[in-house]
Amino acid sequence: MRKYLAEFLGTFMLVFLGTATVVIAKGDVLAIGLAFGLAITVSAYAFGGISGGHFNPAVTTAMLINRRIDAADAIGYIIAQIIGAIVASAAVKSFVSALGLSATLLGQTDFPKIGSGMAFFVEALVTFLFLMVILNVTSNDHGNADFAGLTIGVTLAFLIIVALNLTGGSLNPARSIGPAIFAGGSALSHLWVYILAPEVGAILAAFCARVMGSED
C-alpha cells in the first residue's frame, strides 16, 4: 500500500504543479518545461525510495516489460497514477475557479496545429527518448542512482520544451487523462493519442534498453 500511495502522491505533485503552471504561465515554454522537470525531480527524491518513482503509466509499462516490477504491482501503480492525476486536475480546476479564469484552461494536452498521425509520432518519439534516459540512468549495471532524479527531471524539461507547441508535451498518459476528463472537447476526443503513443514509445525503449545491456 505504501508503494501505491507514493505513486499517487508523486503523480499528483507532477500533474498539479505542471498543469497549474501551464494555466498561469500563459504559453511560456521555458517556465512550463521547467515546472514539469522540477516537479518530477522533487517527486523522485521524495517518493522514489518507496515506489521506484514511476509517476507515469508508460514508465511502469517499460519496467514491467524489463521485469523490474511484477504485473500485480504494475496494475496497482497505474491505477494509483491515474487517480493521482485526476485528483490533481480537480484541484487545478478549483484553483482556476478561484482565480476567475476560464474553466476550460486546465493544462490539458491537444494538437490543434498538426494532424493526429504527426502528434502520435511526436509523443511516441519524446516518450521513447525519455524512457531511454530513465532505463539507463536507473540501470543496476551502469546507472547512477545518486543523480537519477535530477537527470530525469532535466530530460523531461527539455523534451516538453521541444514538444510543447506541437502536442503539449505529455509523455505521460496519466498527465493527459486527468485534465481531459474535466476539460472535455478535443482534449478528450484526442486522448487516445496521449494514451497509446507514450505506451508505444515506452515499449520500444524497453526493448532497446535490453539490446544496450541496461537490463542484464
Curated annotation (Swiss-Prot):
Single GO MF descriptor: water channel activity
Short motif (NPA 2): ranges: 172-174
Entry's localization field: Cell membrane
Keywords of the record: Cell membrane, Membrane, Transmembrane, Transmembrane helix, Transport
Domain of life: Bacteria
Pfam families: MIP
Gene Ontology CC terms: plasma membrane
Functional description taken from the UniProt entry: Probable transporter that facilitates the transmembrane diffusion of an unknown substrate. Is not permeable to water, dihydroxyacetone, glycerol, urea, H(2)O(2) and D/L-lactic acid.
Family, similarity comment: Belongs to the MIP/aquaporin (TC 1.A.8) family.
Protein name: Glycerol uptake facilitator protein-like 6
Gene: glpF6
